[in-house]
Every structure is written in C-alpha cells, then in structure tokens.
Amino acid sequence: MGGCMSTPEAPKKTAETKQVPSTSTSSRPPQASTSATATAAGAGTSAANGTANGIKGDTTATNRVGTSGGQGLAAALASTEPPGAQDSKGNKDRSNQIDRQLEDDQKKFRKECKILLLGSGESGKSTIVKQMKIIHQNGYSKDELLSFRGVIYKNVLDSAQALIMAMRKIGVDPEDANNRSYADRILEYRMDAGLDAVIPSEILYNIESLWHDPVIPSVMDRSSEFYLMDSATYFFANIRKIAGPDYVPDEADVLRARTKTTGISETRFNMGQLSIHMFDVGGQRSERKKWIHCFEAVTSIIFCVALSEYDQVLLEESGQNRMQESLVLFESVINSRWFLRTSVILFLNKIDLFKQKLPKVPLVQYFPEYTGGADINKAAKYILWRFTQTNRARLSVYPHLTQATDTSNIRLVFAAVKETILQNALRDSGIL
C-alpha cells in the first residue's frame, strides 16, 4: 500500500488532506501536549488544501497519459527518414498505433470505482450518501423533499417521547404544570404509519413548550444515561417551521432526518474522470451479515465514526458503549482478508457535537488512559490513535475530521478523498 508514518506523532492535523496514510501500531498513546488533530474549522481549511492536491492528482494523471503518448510520437517522428525514404503508409501505421495506445490508456483510466461505506449505527453513513446527491446529483427535487416530511415528523415525535421517558426514569418532572399535562399527551399520541402521515400542530406546539421548560437543560446534561437521536435538538429548535401547514423540508432538514438503513443501497455519481459506485449498508448488528456481498473489488472503504458517541450506548444494546463497538467493528474490517489491497478513509465524524460535549462530559471517564483534558485537538488525536492501534494488517489509513451535516465541509473533504480514490484507481488500472 502507500507510504507509512507513525500515528502517535502522526499527521499534524487529522483532517489535513495531504494524502499521507497512517499505519502505526505503536502501543503508546499520543502525547497530550501535541496538537496534531485539526478542529472543525481546520477540517475545512485543510480540506481546501486537499482540493488543490486532488486537482494536482488529476493533472498528473492526465500528463502521464499525454506525456507517454507524446514521447511515443516524438520517437516516431525522430525515426522517420527524410521525405521519399519511406512510403506514407508506414508513418500512418505508426500514428495509428500511438492513437490506439492513448485510447487504451484512457479506457483503463475511466474505470468504475467501488466505495464501501462502513461504520456502526448512526455514525453518519447515510448522511454522507445524501451529501453526494446534493453535491454530485443536483440535489433534491420538491417531491423528493416532501417525501421526507413523514420521516421528520416521526423523528420529532420519537425524540420527544424518548425525552419524556428519560425524565421519568431519572425522576424529573417539568416545572410548568401545563408541560406536565403536555408530556402525558405527547407520550400517549400514536402517529399513523406511512410517509404521508402527519402530526397535529397542537401536538407539535406541546413539544415546543415542553422543550422550553426550565428543567430540560439539567435533563440534557444527563443525556449519556439515555438514548436520544443526535438531530433531536435541531428539530426541537425548528419545531415552528415543522408545524407549519405548508411545511416542505429543506436540505438541512433532510440531512438530519433519521431512518434505519436496512439492506444495501447503491448510489452512482461521477467525480471528475471517476465513476463512483458508493454502497451504504446497515450499521446495526443485525445488518452486518449482509456486508459480505459488497466486499469484492472494493477500491476504498470510508469508515465513519461518530466522535460524539464516546459516552453513548447502542440502540440495540443499552449496556454497550458505542465507541467501543466502533473500535471492535473497525478492527474486524481493517484486518479482514477481503481488504488486503484496499485503502481505508477514516471519517471522524460529528466534530461539531464532539466539540460541544467534551467540556461537559470528560473523555477520561470513558477512556482512563486519556490525559488531554477538554482540548478538542488532543481528544480527537487520542481517538484516532485508538483506531490506528487496531491496524495489524498495516493498511493505508487516511483520517479526516468531518461534519456530515455541513455540505461545505463534506464538499471540501471529498476533494481530498478524490485524490486517494484517484491514486488507487490509477494503480489498479496499471497506469501507475
């Protein structure tokens, strides 16, 4: 695979888009004093550098094909004897041969690349797929946006009911008497099935009132004790828009809409000269047995990890820490015999939520070995180190900090990812 470097001293910025793979297996944690992981803002800046690198990669590839053909043409001309020494047929044959070689190289280069999206449940895989539609497939039509309305209503209701049940579990009631009755009403409400289902505006306004109850901040401080989807706070904050009679979700809403991925879905799009087939598979345990069908001839894996999940438990097993589950899954993927020639692009996702949570919920409570306090760079670098420790197969790993719900961030990061995929495609095609 590609060149190697030691991750504990590793990429000076996790999101830096210089395509230097990380393959370290050092057993020592990174030094807390080293700031080697970019912040969310750094992710965007360094990804911009990757854009230049990606363009450079494309230019290099083009020059490689063009130069080899040009050298062949020069050699053919240099060997041509003075006029009249040969018949024109020989020159034409040589020219045709050069043209055929150039055409063959271009056909090799235009190969289809398979990318497999892996990661535990709710790590951001499906959000990445939605971003590819927005960035590379002209986004969503109005009808497509409307198709998410029922999903968003269900997300809002499920989140409100989960919050109320959590309040009762920890023994907290709303301070406002009206909100106490609203909580009962919300908990009893059952939404109709189907994409066209709606929630009465009265229920939505009850949810808004409950969300603004004075007791809610103290409940949210204990969010590691119960399950609440990441987008809950976003939808609660936008409840008035959602409650409108003519509500049409926008792309920001769609990116945060949550549905469980079942089976395998494929998205096709072009990135420059590359034709990409991206496979999104279910992240829940029950879905992982289906992944095997996607493993053959994969160019790259994008493995998504939610940085903010370090204090959260699995949806399907409340006693299992999500970050530990992701580590186990990553270890099984990166050391699998299916991926011996595959590069792994590691998305350390949800950097925005991680930055908000870290000062309130110390990472050391869940990883006693960590010594970096509330420093976002040190914390992200430590988590990266934990993942690279599992890389016994010493595959090339390309880490990036991401915020999957931010289209501008993903656009810039994928400019860098393109270079990685491009180099693998060129290598596999025999051009490199």
UniProtKB/Swiss-Prot annotation:
Keywords: GTP-binding, Hydrolase, Lipoprotein, Magnesium, Metal-binding, Myristate, Nucleotide-binding, Palmitate, Transducer. GO terms for molecular function: G protein-coupled receptor binding; G-protein beta/gamma-subunit complex binding; GTP binding; GTPase activity; metal ion binding. It comes from Cryptococcus neoformans var. neoformans serotype D (strain JEC21 / ATCC MYA-565). GO terms for biological process: adenylate cyclase-activating G protein-coupled receptor signaling pathway. It holds the Pfam family G-alpha. The gene is GPA1. Residues 21-52 have a biased composition (Low complexity). G proteins are composed of 3 units; alpha, beta and gamma. The alpha chain contains the guanine nucleotide binding site. This is Guanine nucleotide-binding protein subunit alpha. A lipid is attached at G2 (N-myristoyl glycine). Residues 111-432 form the G-alpha domain. The keyword GTP-binding applies. Residues 114-127 are annotated as: G1 motif. Belongs to the G-alpha family. One of its GO terms (cellular component) is heterotrimeric G-protein complex. Residues 253-261 are annotated as: G2 motif.
